């Protein structure tokens, strides 16, 4: 089963990083087997599954009860191991150091999460966040700039053909990436 295909994931009512954005996110994270990976606001676990399938040791943080169940189901379906941290970040996060961190949701606690990420990301490590609001994307970029990270800021817009042959736009996503000095 491929993690690049949305139809392979259990979703329910939980938002999921769509295939095109997931592929670009995984590329931006530059995953290497053996790395420690943290997924904050893991949702359905689609990014966690991709990281685990790439050979990373994965911790997925999520507070929504339905999403927690979907992460378990998706990990099982893809035959990967994901350690689940149930609750809000950064409250339930450990003192573990991570090589790669993905922020998929912040529940209004972006500043606290960014502080945690900065303190627990290894030197040379990559943190990447996908945001639907420009305000959070800009806050993340400014955080990275102020701390000397190498950073990129992108807006990703995807359209898909519908059954009538017309292109229908998906919601756009701001992708911000930083590499710690």
What name fits each language-model region?
Residues 29-31, 52, 120-121:
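A generic alpha-to-beta junction signature in SAM-dependent methyltransferases
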Residues 116-174:
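C-terminal substrate-binding/active-site "lid" region of AdoMet-derived donor-dependent transferases
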Residues 61-96, 100:
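S-adenosyl-L-methionine
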Residues 34-43:
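Conserved class I S-adenosyl-L-methionine
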Residues 44-56:
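Conserved SAM-binding loop of SAM-dependent methyltransferases across substrates and taxa
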Residues 1-33, 69-73:
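Class I SAM-dependent transferase core
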Residues 108-116:
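A short, conserved alpha-helix within the catalytic core of class I
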Residues 43, 66, 135:
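Conserved Rossmann-like nucleotide-cofactor binding loop
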């Amino acid at each position: 089963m491929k993690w690049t295909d949305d139809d392979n994931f259990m979703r329910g009512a939980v938002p999921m990083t769509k295939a095109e954005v997931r592929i670009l996110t995984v590329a931006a994270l530059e995953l290497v087997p053996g790395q420690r990976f943290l997924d904050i606001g893991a949702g359905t676990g689609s990014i966690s599954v991709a990281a685990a399938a790439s050979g990373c040791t994965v911790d997925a943080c999520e507070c929504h009860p339905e999403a927690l169940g979907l992460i378990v189901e998706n990990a099982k379906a893809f035959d990967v191991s994901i350690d689940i941290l149930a609750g809000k970040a950064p409250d339930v996060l450990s003192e573990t150091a991570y090589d790669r961190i993905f922020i998929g949701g912040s529940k209004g606690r972006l500043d606290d999460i960014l502080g945690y990420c900065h303190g627990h990301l290894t030197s040379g490590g990559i943190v990447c966040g996908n945001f639907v609001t420009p305000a959070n994307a800009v806050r993340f970029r400014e955080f990275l700039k102020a701390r000397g990270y190498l950073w990129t800021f992108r807006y990703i817009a995807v359209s898909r053909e519908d059954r009538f042959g017309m292109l229908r736009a998906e919601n756009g996503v701001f992708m911000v990436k930083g590499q710690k000095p």
